[in-house]
Amino acid sequence: MNARHARYPFLGDARDAVEEAGVDLARVVTEDDAVVERARERVVSALTDGTIGEPAATVSTRVEVLSYPVARVLVSIVDESVLVRKYATAEADAAYDRFTADESTDTDLKSVSDTTRVSRDTLLSEFDLRAHVHATPDAHTVDVPTYLLLASSLRDDDWRLVNRALDDGRVPVTDAELDTLIREAIRERVADGLPLSVPDQIADALDEPVAAIQDALADLDLTREIDTVVPELFPPCMKHLLDQVQRGDHLPHHARFAITSFLSNVGLSTDEIVDIYEVNPGFGEEMTRYQTDHIQGDSSPTEYTAPSCATMKAYGNCVNPDDLCDAINHPLSYYEVKLDDGDDDDLADWRDREDDDSPD
């Protein structure tokens, strides 16, 4: 195990190095507190600030390398989709920062030896992308199927294929854009296979760090950047309220706040929410825009989260609950589970549906 494995623990040769060292994971989690603590830090930091934390100077290369597979075990034991996503994103972001620094000619690499660096070409080969990414005089082109696969989770309109130039079945991309696509490949690699099946012997030894992660998860702000709008997957309560809005029914203030805050939390802009309300006879653009901006924190110091299930029940807005409703306590949690259980190929954001101009 070397320094490059510590910086890029998802690489195949890092995994091979761990196997060649004959590491017994069951012994590590029971006897090596430093590895377990660093693994806990990776996961908790992913939840609290979107990073994997910076290892202390006293953390050895071995500890840093082994903390990665132990972190994946911790994520698997907790077994929450939001944790898998946030952890994989944090690991990918950390790797992105490192390999783009390695590539940059403007970065002082005196402290980064050749044995710790990873090039863009190395990563393309690692993810079997070399045959699908082609050098050009300007930068690169990416085969369309590969581009669609890697860009599928990137929500900015600039990544939509309809907004890209095409060159003989390939998508031209800049160096920076290619690095972003590589970051997505890393994220998929980290998330692949999670949650793992964890033997009871290992899970029992990790009770304390698992409890710490669960505490951090409980404190997680639900107003995360979902930014995917698939009304078919909305919880029954929000489907009902959205149907009422689109039928032109009058909604009391608490119901209007519930659906507006939910739509805001899942990624709709003020303009998009105003467009939805236009069909309602009680619609007033100025007031709707003001209320939505206030909920989103644009005109107030607070960004509001959609009401919890308990609040929805208290106001009589909990309707048609299904089996999943019994297992969650917040409409956003319901939607998150539905998104994670869905097939990415079938999750068409209503904003991307060419034939629809509203989330029916």
Curated annotation (Swiss-Prot):
Region of interest called Disordered, as start-end residue ranges on this chain: 340-360
Single GO term (MF): 4 iron, 4 sulfur cluster binding
UniProtKB keywords: 4Fe-4S, DNA replication, Iron, Iron-sulfur, Metal-binding, Primosome
Name listed for the protein in its UniProt record: DNA primase large subunit PriL
NCBIfam families: PRK02249.1-4 (NF002590)
One GO CC term on file: primosome complex
Similarity-based family: Belongs to the eukaryotic-type primase large subunit family.
Record bears the keyword Disulfide bond: no
Role this protein plays: Regulatory subunit of DNA primase, an RNA polymerase that catalyzes the synthesis of short RNA molecules used as primers for DNA polymerase during DNA replication. Stabilizes and modulates the activity of the small subunit, increasing the rate of DNA synthesis, and conferring RNA synthesis capability. The DNA polymerase activity may enable DNA primase to also catalyze primer extension after primer synthesis. May also play a role in DNA repair.
HAMAP family: DNA_primase_lrg_arc (MF_00701)
Assembly mode: Heterodimer of a small subunit (PriS) and a large subunit (PriL).
Cofactor(s) it depends on: [4Fe-4S] cluster
Cofactor binding notes: Binds 1 [4Fe-4S] cluster.
Pfam family for this entry, one: DNA_primase_lrg
Gene Ontology process terms (BP): DNA replication initiation; DNA replication, synthesis of primer
InterPro entries: DNA_primase_lsu_euk/arc, DNA_primase_lsu_PriL
Residues that hold [4Fe-4S] cluster according to the record: C237, C309, C318, C325
Keyword DNA damage belongs to the record: no
